[in-house]
Amino acid sequence: MELKATPRKSQEKLAPGMIPAVAYNKEKNVTFAIERKAFDRAFRQQGTTGLFDIVIEGGETFPALVKAVQMDKRRREAIHADFYMVTYGEPVEVSVPVHTTGKSQGEIQGGLVDVVVHSLNVIAPGPRRIPQEITVDVTNLNIGDHVTAGQIKLPEGVKLAVEPDLVVLSVLPPRLSAEELEAQAQAAQVAGMVASGELSEAAAEAVLEGSASLDAVKAGEEGSRAQQETEEASERADQGQ
């Protein structure tokens, strides 16, 4: 996509509607100005993987990729753009967005596909062969499954620029509601109390079934133990007479 620009010296005042920009590589950098609206439209369409032909008025023309965009947070518009100059036919490393397709078996079971890496660094054989996105089919994934960078099929000639064992996405189990989390915590607490002898198995069953509250059962158990201790003390006293 062609993007027209005007030459600009550093700190030079900008014409209305223009934003400063710089393009660079290992050998040189060029400063210029571009129309904000034209850049916004082009960047929404091309992103960081789309190739731009920067045409500087009265100067050179070169291919480049968007490296970074500084935004005005309040107005939500670009205020500065960085481009990286590339050379046709030479490999180039880029960050490509990761998208999923299909509905996983895990999602059907109530789970969730968690995309951990939203953009994957790859090396394309040339600027014109940069993939616009990387698509991962999650249809056959079950809860607990994950996909690593090395398992993703890339376009011909495109190579990974990250470790192949990098986890890109995984399928998580269903999220528990607040009530389910509370019930889970109570079950663990009750199990611990049974193990320590604080609750009888019958009392624990009543709590877990919802027929009695834990506080009520604890009070009842404590009362029973106190009564038993009193009876035992009385029995010992009778035997001592």
From Swiss-Prot:
Could you tell me the superkingdom of the organism this chain comes from?
A: Bacteria
Q: Name one GO cellular component term.
A: cytosolic large ribosomal subunit
Disulfide linkages recorded for this protein, renumbered to the chain, are none
Q: Read off the CDD domains from this record.
A: Ribosomal_L25_TL5_CTC
Which Pfam families does the protein's record reference?
A: Ribosomal_L25p, Ribosomal_TL5_C
One GO term (biological process): translation
UniProt keyword annotations, A-Z = Ribonucleoprotein, Ribosomal protein, RNA-binding, rRNA-binding
Which Gene Ontology terms cover its molecular function?
5S rRNA binding; structural constituent of ribosome
Which parts of this chain are annotated as the region Disordered?
A: 214-241
> What function is annotated for this protein?
This is one of the proteins that binds to the 5S RNA in the ribosome where it forms part of the central protuberance.
Quaternary structure note? Part of the 50S ribosomal subunit; part of the 5S rRNA/L5/L18/L25 subcomplex. Contacts the 5S rRNA. Binds to the 5S rRNA independently of L5 and L18.
Q: Which family does it belong to?
A: Belongs to the bacterial ribosomal protein bL25 family. CTC subfamily.
What's the protein here called? Large ribosomal subunit protein bL25
- Tell me which species this is from: Deinococcus geothermalis (strain DSM 11300 / CIP 105573 / AG-3a)
Per the UniProt record, the lineage of the source organism begins with: Bacteria, Thermotogati, Deinococcota, Deinococci, Deinococcales
